[in-house]
């Protein structure tokens, strides 16, 4: 009788060890899931920050592009006016409207 009772104790001990092992594995899995959730939250926050930064960069770059476009337009107009004045003087000298 004691031999069979001793085997039962081993079986119960083995089952408890297995249950403890499964419990440890489940605890690790829950910790990993929580860490993953925290990592996802951190990643989402970084993504939102990056999105806001990219919007700011987009508007700033558009303003800079517009500023340089106007600067180029002003330079082209200035060059055209200078060329027109030079051509006007050449024509006026050639026609004799301005005495030499």
From Swiss-Prot:
Molecular-function annotations in GO: chloride channel inhibitor activity; SNAP receptor activity; syntaxin binding
Gene3D superfamilies in the cross-refs: 1.20.5.110
Q: Which residues carry this modification: Phosphoserine?
A: 4, 54
Residue intervals on the Cytoplasmic side:
1-74
TM region positions: 75-95
Membrane topology summary: Single-pass type IV membrane protein
Residues annotated as carrying Phosphothreonine in the record are 27, 47, 53
List residues of the v-SNARE coiled-coil homology domain.
11-71
**Which CDD domains does the record match to this protein?**
R-SNARE_VAMP8
Instruction: Outline which residue ranges sit on the Vesicular face.
Output: 96-100
Tell me one Pfam family matched here. Answer: Synaptobrevin
> Which UniProt keyword terms apply here?
Antiviral defense, Autophagy, Cell membrane, Coiled coil, Cytoplasmic vesicle, Endosome, Lysosome, Membrane, Phosphoprotein, Protein transport, Transmembrane, Transmembrane helix, Transport
**Superkingdom in the source lineage:** Eukaryota
Write out the function statement from the record.
SNAREs, soluble N-ethylmaleimide-sensitive factor-attachment protein receptors, are essential proteins for fusion of cellular membranes. SNAREs localized on opposing membranes assemble to form a trans-SNARE complex, an extended, parallel four alpha-helical bundle that drives membrane fusion. VAMP8 is a SNARE involved in autophagy through the direct control of autophagosome membrane fusion with the lysososome membrane via its interaction with the STX17-SNAP29 binary t-SNARE complex. Also required for dense-granule secretion in platelets.
Protein family (similarity comment): Belongs to the synaptobrevin family.
Q: How does it assemble?
A: Forms a SNARE complex composed of VAMP8, SNAP29 and STX17 involved in fusion of autophagosome with lysosome. Found in a number of SNARE complexes with NAPA, SNAP23, SNAP25, STX1A, STX4, STX7, STX8 and VTI1B. Interacts with PICALM. SNARE complex formation and binding by PICALM are mutually exclusive processes for VAMP8. Interacts with SBF2/MTMR13. Interacts with RAB21 (in GTP-bound form) in response to starvation; the interaction probably regulates VAMP8 endolysosomal trafficking. Interacts with STX17; this interaction is increased in the absence of TMEM39A. Interacts with TRIM6.
Report the protein name in the record: Vesicle-associated membrane protein 8
Q: What organism is listed for this UniProt entry?
A: Bos taurus (Bovine)
Q: Corresponding gene?
A: VAMP8
């Amino acid at each position: 009788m004691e031999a069979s009772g001793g085997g039962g104790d081993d079986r119960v001990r083995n089952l408890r060890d297995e249950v403890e092992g499964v419990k440890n594995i489940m605890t690790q899995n829950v910790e990993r899931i929580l860490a993953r959730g925290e990592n996802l939250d951190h990643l989402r926050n970084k993504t939102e920050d990056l999105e806001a930064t990219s919007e700011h960069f987009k508007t700033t770059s558009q303003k800079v592009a517009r500023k340089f476009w106007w600067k180029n337009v002003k330079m082209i107009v200035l060059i055209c006016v200078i060329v027109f004045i030079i051509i006007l003087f050449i024509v006026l000298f050639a026609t004799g409207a301005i005495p030499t």
